[in-house]
């Protein structure tokens, strides 16, 4: 049997151009700000939250489970958190997954959302370039460093 669900509150950070106002904030930082504001606005206490569903499209290789990171910073550590990713619709997928948890009786209160920081996207490079950059960083003299960098094509 399906239960009815309701969205009781929402919050968000403003859209800003990459590399500007929020340049020092990661997707996790933005998520923490939004969830804290959500909890304040809604009056829901952390101990009343049964689950956190949170996502991002461009995952930080240093913190690939954004939901757990945001959850640990905003909710009791006993609240399970799952990370979702769906290109251009991650927050919507998080909300749909949260509604499903409630409808199916697995949870009563779920926090759902997503955040992104295009200022902090991981940039991958070819192995040959990586080796040259590492070689340049290990060079003992400026001349050796420049010589290594000059080989980049």
Residue spans of the language-model regions?
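Acyl-thioester C-C bond-transforming condensing/cleaving domain
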Residues: 2-3, 17-46, 60-153
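Short polar catalytic/cofactor-binding loops
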Residues: 10-15
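Short glycine-rich phosphate-binding loop at a beta-alpha junction
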Residues: 48-55, 111
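Conserved PLP-binding active-site segment in aminotransferase class I/II-type PLP enzymes
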Residues: 1-9
């Amino acid at each position: 049997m399906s239960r009815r669900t309701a969205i009781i509150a929402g919050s968000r950070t403003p859209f800003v151009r990459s590399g500007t106002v929020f340049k020092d904030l990661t997707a996790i930082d933005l998520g923490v700000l939004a969830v804290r504001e959500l909890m304040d606005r809604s009056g829901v206490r952390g101990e009343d939250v049964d689950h956190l569903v949170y996502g991002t499209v461009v995952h930080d290789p240093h913190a690939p489970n954004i939901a757990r990171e945001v959850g640990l910073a905003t909710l009791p550590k006993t609240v399970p958190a799952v990370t979702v990713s769906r290109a251009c619709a991650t927050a919507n997928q998080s909300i749909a997954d949260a509604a499903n948890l409630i409808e199916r009786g697995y949870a009563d209160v779920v926090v759902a959302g997503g955040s992104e920081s295009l200022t902090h996207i991981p940039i991958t490079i070819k192995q040959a370039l990586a080796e040259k950059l590492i070689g340049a960083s290990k060079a003992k003299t400026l001349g050796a460093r420049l010589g290594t960098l000059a080989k980049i094509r």
